[in-house]
């Protein structure tokens, strides 16, 4: 049996002001995939703590960095695995909302998990630079995200935005496990 390493990442936001603070926070941790120079990313898998297909949103292609209206589905098998295909990230990040999963693992071609990110965030992103052949994939827990292309409201009305009262503290964490 190999060693297992865990790293806990803690986000803490404090509001020292007398006014309400509106904010979003998210990570951008990147993990090697493939784990050696011989393999291809498209031979690897995600494993989720669900056997339901994941619905995800896509960044609009207008260059503004906003969430478009289009959604797609990442097929998840009954055992929780989803193939990382060659063109999965061609249209930027996969934005998975509504607590559809809280554990995401990267798995070798023989479906053995080598890295797991566990979180209680309401949404997360999966990303690797499109068309660059980058040797990594990001698994990004988020408490908030970019606005939709159709949004024209205030900070108080943002989807997945967070509110912190005067003197309040927001504390969340996620865990990275390497096997």
Which sequence ranges carry the predicted segments?
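Short, small-residue-biased leader/transition segments that mark boundaries at the very start
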Residues: 1-5
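Short Pro-Gly-centered flexible turn/kink motifs
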Residues: 11, 162-178
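Asparagine-centered strand-capping/turn motif at beta-strand->loop junctions
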Residues: 11-17
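Active-site/ligand-binding surface loops and adjacent short beta/alpha elements
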Residues: 20-22, 30-119
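A residue-level signal for conserved active-site and pocket-lining positions in enzyme catalytic cores
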Residues: 28, 139, 167
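Glycine-rich active-site loops that engage anionic ligands at enzyme catalytic sites
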Residues: 107-147
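Short, structured beta-strand/loop micro-motifs enriched in basic residues and often containing a Trp
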Residues: 149-156
């Amino acid at each position: 049996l190999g060693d297992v390493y865990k790293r806990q990442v803690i986000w803490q936001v404090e509001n020292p002001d007398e006014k309400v603070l509106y904010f979003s926070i998210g990570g951008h941790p990147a993990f090697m995939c493939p784990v050696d120079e011989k393999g291809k990313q498209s031979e690897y898998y995600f494993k989720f703590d669900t056997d339901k297909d994941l619905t995800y949103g896509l960044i609009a292609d207008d260059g503004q960095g906003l969430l478009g209206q289009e959604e797609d589905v990442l097929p998840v098998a009954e055992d929780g695995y989803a193939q990382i295909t060659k063109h999965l990230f061609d249209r930027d990040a996969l934005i998975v909302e509504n607590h559809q999963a809280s554990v995401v693992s990267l798995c070798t071609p023989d479906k053995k998990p080598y890295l797991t990110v566990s979180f209680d965030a309401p949404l997360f992103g999966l990303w690797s630079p499109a068309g660059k052949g980058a040797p990594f994939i990001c698994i990004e827990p988020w408490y908030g995200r970019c606005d939709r292309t159709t949004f024209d409201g205030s900070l108080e009305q943002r989807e997945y935005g967070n509110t912190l009262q005067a003197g309040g503290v927001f504390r969340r964490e996620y865990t990275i496990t390497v096997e």
